[in-house]
Amino acid sequence: VLTFNAKRHRYHYNFAENKILNAYKLDASWADYDFCPANGYLAFTEGNNLRILSPDNTVGIVTDETADGIVCGKSVHQNEFGIHKGTFWSPGGSALAFYRMDESMVTDYPFVNITTRCATAEPHKYPMAGMKSHEVTVGVYNLETKKTVWLKTGLPKEKYLTNIAWSPDEKSIYIAELNREQNEMHLVRYSALTGEKEADLFTETDEHYVEPQHPVLFLPNNPDQFIWQSERDGYNHLYLYNTEGKLLKQLT
């Protein structure tokens, strides 16, 4: 399937069937598009809020934040630790996990925009060392109930929530949680239905830093096992785990 934009429309074209599967009318203020092939919905942000667009071009409101410094559905943690987006569709398309970031406590830092004719100053929130950092939470929006469940990630609030992944049955969400010192990582499983923590599967530590870059990857023929990519021994290797956090074997 080829995805492309033209004249403020987004199209999904199927080469095998030689036809357009979906055509969405876009607004100039929308960004951060995330298409779900399972249900044909398109997640996007409008300002600092998250929306969804159905195949019949009906817009649904996921968040309606009005306070300054609250951002939903966008990439967080300065795009570190493999983070490049802020929305995560469940495999079957029944739910949408997303980041909510509160950066109201973070001071502004004057970045310079050099793409303008004359360079202009553009303040952005940037957490300086030793000062307050932003606080991130993860919501799970159910398309049927139109309600959001928040994962109970707990304290400390300044930890990094990285590498979000869904279980194949859509019942659980896996998150690599990293402390602000970046030297201790916990792979944690949460219930996508209640938000409760289900298990702390394993921990990685390093005297210098731990840098998770990839979410868990489930085996297509075994939903009870996943591959974890790590540099825990100083080299980039793959490890096979079961969903209870037991290391089955080192693959590379």
Show which residues each predicted segment covers.
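Predominantly five- to eight-bladed beta-propeller fold
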Residues: 1-2, 61-87, 98-150
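Beta-strand C-termini and the immediately following turn/loop, strongest in propeller blades
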Residues: 2-9, 14-15, 40-49, 54, ...
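Asp-box/WD-like beta-propeller blade repeats and closely related beta-sheet repeat scaffolds
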Residues: 7-52, 58-86
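Short loop/turn segments that connect beta-strands within beta-propeller blades
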Residues: 15-18, 54-57, 142-146, 192-194, ...
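Beta-propeller fold detector
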Residues: 21-25, 59-67, 149-152, 197-203, ...
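Repeated scaffold domains used in trafficking and secretory/extracellular systems
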Residues: 30-34, 162, 211-216
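Short glycine-/Asp-/Thr-/Trp-enriched loop segments that recur within the blades
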Residues: 68-83, 156-161, 206-213
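Beta-propeller and related beta-repeat scaffolds in trafficking/envelope systems
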Residues: 129-134, 156-157, 203-217, 252
